[in-house]
């Protein structure tokens, strides 16, 4: 196909079964939405791994809930002796190089060659660990994700980044390694605890604030989405809209050649909130605090009106997410977070702040966030946090 023809196909295309992405650099991958992913009559997963050795990895909770169904599916659809399932520790504290090495050791002991497939079944942490292992094993092999959490389906499951924490820094080591396929079954979300759902909703709020006022308004009307009895129509709209928005935003800049990214809303202060807090807050909870702080900064810097700021913070609170963490939301630590982001982003701040609902901009320089403004934003959040 000619370069001109490829250029015409670039972008994200949605169909009834999911999304296809073709990036300007030629990277392409599929994100599927399917019912009954572990039903032996569903050929989707088997079709992606046919004729290859498969080494699957699951966390303990996923193994307890879905392990039997996963094994029954692989047993029914794949050749005997061509697959194995292994449990690995999940949780942010296990997102380490040691976990990646363990995955690679299991793969080697299982006879996985360069034509084999690593299968990650779980949330974002399992996907990050297994994806990073796949990027290095035999200089890079195919891997597939079955995303079982809301964060996994709307965030980790639609991008190409993998990584682990190291040197007291979140995602210090990692690789851009697109999954061969990313499979999402809405029914898998039904077994999630409320806290996991809320963390996923934080990432959805992120996309709504920066890109889609309609999605934001839907969440304002139903902050209990995924936690209520319903026919699932709203939840389908929310998940698919979030997936599409994220993929469309990632596509032109898949490997982050441009470090100014709107999807980094909520991800400037949150790495320090997570790390300094000993991962007491989940990732989505730290992102929520970051978004609330960024909304107040936008208000104080004259980039957003008070009503937009109020709506962002109020929605987060109505969902049940924190908007302030006394142990980490100190001027000292949040200044440290700004400097760390400035350094990580090529000595440009690229702080994403809302300018309204469904739109955002960047604060580019450290000096554009004066110490007194940061302190005032934290004071405002502290007052709101006390009334939660």
Curated annotation (Swiss-Prot):
InterPro entries: Dehydroquinate_synthase, DHQS/DOIS_N, DHQS_C, EEVS-like. It comes from Streptomyces glaucescens. Belongs to the sugar phosphate cyclases superfamily. EEVS-like family. Zn(2+) binds at residues 203, 267, 283. Catalyzes the cyclization of D-sedoheptulose 7-phosphate to 2-epi-5-epi-valiolone. Probably involved in acarbose biosynthesis. This is 2-epi-5-epi-valiolone synthase. The keyword NAD applies. Its cofactor is NAD(+); Co(2+); Zn(2+). CDD domains: EEVS. One of its GO terms (molecular function) is nucleotide binding. NAD(+) binds at residues 92-95, 124-128, 148-149, 161, 170, 188-191. The keyword Cytoplasm does not apply. Keywords: Cobalt, Lyase, Metal-binding, NAD, Nucleotide-binding, Zinc. It comes from the Bacteria. GO terms for biological process: antibiotic biosynthetic process. It catalyses: D-sedoheptulose 7-phosphate = 2-epi-5-epi-valiolone + phosphate. Its EC number is 4.2.3.152.
């Amino acid at each position: 196909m000619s370069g001109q023809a490829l250029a015409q196909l670039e972008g994200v295309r949605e169909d009834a079964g999911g999304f296809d992405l073709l990036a300007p650099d030629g990277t392409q991958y599929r994100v599927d939405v399917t019912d009954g992913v572990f039903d032996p009559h569903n050929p989707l997963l088997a079709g992606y791994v046919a004729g290859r050795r498969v080494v699957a990895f699951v966390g303990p909770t996923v193994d307890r809930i879905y392990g039997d169904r996963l094994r029954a599916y692989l047993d029914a659809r794949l050749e005997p002796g061509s697959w194995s399932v292994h449990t690995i520790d999940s949780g942010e504290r296990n997102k380490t190089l040691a976990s990646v090495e363990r995955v690679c050791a299991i793969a080697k002991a299982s006879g996985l060659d360069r034509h084999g497939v690593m299968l990650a079944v779980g949330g974002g942490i399992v996907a990050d660990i297994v994806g990073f292992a796949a990027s290095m094993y035999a200089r890079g092999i195919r891997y597939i994700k079955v995303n079982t959490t809301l964060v996994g389906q709307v965030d980790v499951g639609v991008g190409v980044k993998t990584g682990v924490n190291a040197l007291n820094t979140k995602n210090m080591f990692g690789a851009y390694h697109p999954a061969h396929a990313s499979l999402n079954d809405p029914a898998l979300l039904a077994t999630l605890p409320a806290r996991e759902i809320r963390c996923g909703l934080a990432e959805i709020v992120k996309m709504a604030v920066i890109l889609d006022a309609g999605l934001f308004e839907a969440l304002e009307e139903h902050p209990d989405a995924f936690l209520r009895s319903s026919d699932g129509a709203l939840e389908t709209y929310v998940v698919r809209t979030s997936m599409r928005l994220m993929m469309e935003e990632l596509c032109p800049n898949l490997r982050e050649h441009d470090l100014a990214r709107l999807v980094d809303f909520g991800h400037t202060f949150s790495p320090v909130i997570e790390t300094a807090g000993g991962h007491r807050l989940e990732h989505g909870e730290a992102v929520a605090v970051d978004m609330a702080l960024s909304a107040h900064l936008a208000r104080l810097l004259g980039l957003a009106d008070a009503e937009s700021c109020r709506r962002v913070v109020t929605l987060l609170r109505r969902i049940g997410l924190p908007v302030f963490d006394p142990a980490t939301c100190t001027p000292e630590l949040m200044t440290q977070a700004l400097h760390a982001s400035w350094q990580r982003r090529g000595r440009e701040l690229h702080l994403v702040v809302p300018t309204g609902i469904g739109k955002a901009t960047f604060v580019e320089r450290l000096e554009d966030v004066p110490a007194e403004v940061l302190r005032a934003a934290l004071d405002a959040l502290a007052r709101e946090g006390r009334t939660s």
